[in-house]
Amino acid sequence: MKVRPSVKPMCEHCKVIRRKGRVMIICSANPKHKQRQGK
C-alpha cells in the first residue's frame, strides 16, 4: 500500500474507490498498484 498526496490509476485494472472518506486505488492484476490518498 502506497500513501501518496495524489493517487492515479497505474494500469487499466486499477479502480478508484472511496472508503471512509479516503480515495483509494485497488488493482486486481497487480497488488503493488494499491494506493491510498494521504492527508
Swiss-Prot record:
This is Large ribosomal subunit protein bL36. It comes from the Bacteria. GO terms for cellular component: cytoplasm; ribonucleoprotein complex; ribosome. One of its GO terms (molecular function) is structural constituent of ribosome. It holds the Pfam family Ribosomal_L36. The keyword DNA-binding does not apply. Belongs to the bacterial ribosomal protein bL36 family. PANTHER family: 50S RIBOSOMAL PROTEIN L36, CHLOROPLASTIC (PTHR42888), LARGE RIBOSOMAL SUBUNIT PROTEIN BL36C (PTHR42888:SF1). Keywords: Ribonucleoprotein, Ribosomal protein. One of its GO terms (biological process) is translation.
